[in-house]
A protein has these predicted regions:
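N-terminal nicking endonuclease/strand-transfer module with a His-rich metal-binding environment
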Residues: 1-180
Length: 180
């Protein structure tokens, strides 16, 4: 998913989903905002072409006979089982399509885990960044001919936080065909 916050809103909204029976989350919504921000930053840093993958989604068809089970309980059991097996935070929604012929779960999950303790890096001296966000060694390297800092260049002052890491690297197993 390249817009996890938008997708979560879409699958969990009664206004957007006519036949929404239950929504279950293993973490707070704030987690997804931070995750999206982290993934976007990592994507820019990597210089990769294409779209940033902020999270993944599985759409799981269920037998129509499952409509006999309590929706909240069914979704909670399913989602907690996934989290327990893969250690991934999830949000899930239980739906029917418009014609009520396809009972299914939307399961959105993260490829990253929240670190027990965030890694916060503080500048031990002034740090200079050029227009591309690349760290350069000296202030001279970001000055224009007029002696002023060029547009889009920046300085992180000594003592300021320049990097805050809240999540682990992505779990590669979610990219493999064997996972599916």
């Amino acid at each position: 998913l390249s817009n996890v916050k938008g997708r979560i809103t879409y699958i969990s909204s009664h206004a957007k989903q006519e036949n929404l029976y239950a929504v279950y989350e293993t973490t707070e919504r704030k987690f997804w905002r931070e995750l999206a921000k982290c993934n976007q930053e990592e994507f820019v840093k990597s210089g990769t072409e294409g779209k940033c993958i902020e999270a993944r989604e599985l759409i799981i068809a269920l037998p129509e006979s499952f409509t006999e089970y309590q929706p909240e309980r069914l979704l909670q059991l399913f989602t907690n089982h996934f989290k327990q097996n893969y250690g991934a935070e999830c949000i899930a929604a239980l739906h029917h399509n418009k014609r009520k012929t396809n009972y299914h779960i939307h399961l959105i999950f993260t490829e990253r885990k929240l670190l027990d303790e965030p890694i916060i890096k503080t500048a031990s001296r002034n740090m200079f960044y050029d227009e591309n966000g690349k760290h350069v060694r000296t202030k001279k390297e970001i000055l224009g001919e007029d002696g002023e800092i060029r547009e889009s260049c920046s300085i992180v002052k000594k003592g300021e936080v320049y990097e805050k890491k809240l999540f682990t690297a992505k779990d590669e197993r979610f990219k493999s065909n064997s996972f599916l």
